[in-house]
Amino acid sequence: MKESKLSELLNRRLALLGERANLSLLEQCLHGIERECLRVTGEGRLAQTPHPEALGSALTNEQITTDYSESLLEFITPALPDPADTLASLDKIHRFAYSKLGNEYLWSPSMPCPLPAEEDIPIAYYGTSNIGQLKYVYRKGLALRYGKTMQCIAGIHYNFSLPEKLWPLLKEAEGFVGTDRDFQSSSYIALIRNFRRYSWLLMYLFGASPALDAGFLRGRAHQLEQLDPDTLYLPYATSLRMSDLGYQSNAQAGLTPCYNDLASYTDSLRKAVATPYAPYVEVGTHQDGEWVQLNTNILQIENEYYSNIRPKRVTYTGERPIQALMARGIQYVEVRCLDINPFLPMGIDLTESRFLDAFLLYCALNESPLLTNNSCGNATSNFLSVVKEGRRPGLQLQRDGQPVELKEWAAELLEKIAPLAALLDQSHGGDAHSKALDAQLAKVKDSSLTPSAQVLAAMAAHKESFAQFSLRQSQAHAEFFRSEPLAAEEQAKFEELARSSLAQQAELEQNEVGDFDVFVGSYQASILAISN
């Protein structure tokens, strides 16, 4: 029964979107990519240098910033309708960055290079303005709460939105009672629920972190195996980055990743950013007269909440993410569980992107029953099974309370995603999405084609440790970007962006009024005002 009901809603929606009048709608999905990567020395060690001034201000440059550490770059593309253009934009950012990196490299995988002692990992610095200091103190709080080592893991964030005009069309066809905005938000939450159910598939297909540098765990207990003196791994792992790795945030344990409507999501976040957590209270916000964390609550700010996918809305100046969501609803989703593929210069390619579009469209348009505690638990354990042992022959997952082999379920899911790939091809012309889906089917049939298997195979073939393999890949990608510099006018655009961002930061700092403590106080108050 269930299968046919699934298809009924999906078939209706496919038919509606396949009508000639609506077909071009799907060309208006938007795609943005954020790619994080560590700067490393020629020897593959963490670069201890400040963020290169030639890349502009990490505070105000919209395309090149820093994530947690001064050494952890983040490249941000604009949101564009064609992912080929998004990737072309990401490529240009890489080429510009390489023109300013001197003898440093961008580290190719998600898991970090051999790291120095915790105290020697530099926290990203954003200058003396109040907002710059706020970002710095927030990162000091993360160090205090979770340690710096964890914060050096890099990933790819894939931002995706469906066309705004799609929602009124579906809403009318389905007789939804409520506002357009409510329908749009509840549809995105439905996408997120399905993503929770099926994201294990992305980890099998794109997980690329089966091994890591042995020093990463800092001598703590773990369940990993020793591959060589410098490398820990699990033989069937797909993504140790997304596994628990022995780090559990007890403070965040009460926050469920499963929610059935936007209000319950914003409520739980509002509570978390306003509820003190005893171990943090014990430390306090100051030590020796210096700020060490923004507050002593479960979360300092919303972004501290760790999840595989986030509902998002572009914020206005001074507005908090949660306020934007409550005021204007969900605008797009941010997929946060994608590993950087160390074989690809940008860590992601067009094939992956085209498949992600079909996958996310399937999550959005398919029936999405509400999540119960039970189905939420199954989704979490399926995800954790796949990241730790996704390539284990005969691995079983839980589907609707019944065991099912990963390969069988994966093949069935791809079969169901195929009509969405076909619809995207129909809309865009060509067969790129169906071809991208075929490439994933090949990985399901043969696990040696997965990036995680290929990483282990490459290390074995070259008799390399994780760090040696990663440095070799980093050098190859550096050569790829450096061998073909940007055209002069493109280079000039980035130079101008860097210059104007530095001027913007200087202006912010010059015109700063008011004391930092007061600034933090009013920032806190902005969330408390909506928490009651």
Swiss-Prot record:
Coiled-coil stretches noted in the UniProt entry, renumbered to this chain: none
Annotated pathway: Sulfur metabolism; glutathione biosynthesis; glutathione from L-cysteine and L-glutamate: step 1/2
Keywords: ATP-binding, Glutathione biosynthesis, Ligase, Nucleotide-binding
Record InterPro entries: Gln_synth/guanido_kin_cat_dom, Glu_cys_ligase, Glut_cys_ligase
Pfam families associated with the record: Glu_cys_ligase (PF04262)
EC number: 6.3.2.2
PANTHER family: GLUTAMATE--CYSTEINE LIGASE
Name listed for the protein in its UniProt record: Glutamate--cysteine ligase
Organism encoding this protein: Pseudomonas fluorescens (strain Pf0-1)
